[in-house]
Amino acid sequence: MIVDCHTHVGLAGQHVRGAIHEDLMRTWGRPLWHVPLEEHWAAMTAVDRAIVLAFDAPRVGVEVPNEYVAAYVAQHPEKLIGFASVDPHRDGASDLLEHAITRMGLRGLKIAPIYQHFDPWSSEAYALYEAADALGIPIVWHQGTTFVRDAPLIHARPILLDEIARRFPDLKMWVAHLGHPWCDELIVVVRKHPNLYADMSALTPRPLQLYLALASAVQYNVADKIFFGSDYPFTTVEASLAGLRSVNRVVEGTGFPRIPDEVIEGIIHRNTLELLGIAESAPGARPS
């Protein structure tokens, strides 16, 4: 089974606007984050399951609502799994998360301190971690770099999760994009904590960085804690699979060690949903 653990939906001008839309245009020259639902569905042909992320980051202009994601994944429950997103600054944030999980059928929480403008060690953030822990759902983090100008990198370092993982040892969490450019920092934190994982989404366009991160993961014996993801629409499933399988090309003829084929295929075929505890259907949950 192939699981894409990191995909986005959302329409430019409706869900993605303002500052982040301007920065997308500056960086890519086009509204890259514009994903009609039918395009997302077609893009997931190459995988067996896919996680679809809501995104509640109004401070940078992104609001992909929980309701929108829940209604979409409910159309394809055999394949799609929806994750909620809640800005910790919102009044009643923990209640909003509980509603998204217990009433809408969403299965996890997406948070991004640099886009939601919060300190990962703040009391508001800890209240969300406590709610996720009580609900028994995983959290996916964006802890790494960004093209968005109004996204404070002071909150981006993976090392900030060390204390959180220690305080919540039963809370399953993973960090997107291998925490790049701080991949080694993330890997040593993942090594410490049984409940912490990573995904390699959006790194295949940077093959040297991906190779170095995977080599470090092999050396620290945590390659089995890396999930496959694309970060669609920023990359495609097909390009991510091809880039991962060809990662050793970047060091051909150098004498550097190859990433073993079994490591690469292990990432692609990782039992991600089982490791996160979300392989089974959510009992009693329904979109609302």
Task: State where each predicted segment sits.
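Short aromatic-enriched loop/helix-cap "lid" or pocket-rim segments at secondary-structure transitions
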Residues: 12-19, 64-65, 96, 151-153, ...
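Hydrophobic/aromatic residues located in beta-strands of well-ordered beta-sheets
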Residues: 2, 50, 80-82, 139, ...
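Active-site gating/metal-coordination segments in enzymes
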Residues: 49, 59-155
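Conserved, mostly hydrophobic/aromatic
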Residues: 6, 69, 73, 82, ...
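Mid-to-C-terminal alpha-helical segments outside catalytic/metal-binding sites
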Residues: 1-8, 13-45, 49, 220-227, ...
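Active-site environment of divalent metal-dependent phosphoester hydrolases
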Residues: 10-13, 57-60, 88-92, 145-149, ...
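Catalytic pocket-lining loop regions of alpha/beta-barrel enzymes
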Residues: 18, 107-108, 121-228
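Alpha-helical scaffolding within the catalytic cores
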Residues: 32-40, 64-70, 93-96, 158-160, ...
